[in-house]
Amino acid sequence: MTLPLYDPAWLERMYNNRALVPDHMDYFERWARDSAQVRAHIPCALDVAYGTDVGETLDVFPSARTTGGPVPVLVFIHGGYWRSLDKSDHSFIAPPFTQAGFCVVVVNYALCPGTPDAPVNIPHIARQMEKALGWVWHQIAAHGGDPPRI
């Protein structure tokens, strides 16, 4: 069997998850609603810059446990096939981890394809994630996180 790797229609069917999940907007709306509630009710540092380029921000949700020293760090990179969604849609993932003693970092990045003046591709996003992890390594202790346990 040969896969139709160069058939644009086949590629569109395989990589267009929105078409495969007709009620995807219900999920997006629930994520956004639940995430807004999380940001309103648990301690967090929002829109912290890890760089100067478009999309280079992150949200930090410190551990709910305040004793026992530095805590492990969970870094969450949101999905969206590199072209949609935002870190603010995914704050809902933080509470179970912060309650279990983790510091949670939800990272944003520029979305493909960008603009004509500032194009974005997947290698660009990979470099942004390297930059974000560097920020976490150097700065997370200020939020109670333990850099060796990212």
Segments (PLM) and residue ranges:
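A fold-wide structural signal in alpha/beta-hydrolase
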Residues: 73, 98-110
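Residue-level recognition of the N-termini of beta-strands and the immediately preceding loop/turn
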Residues: 73, 147-150
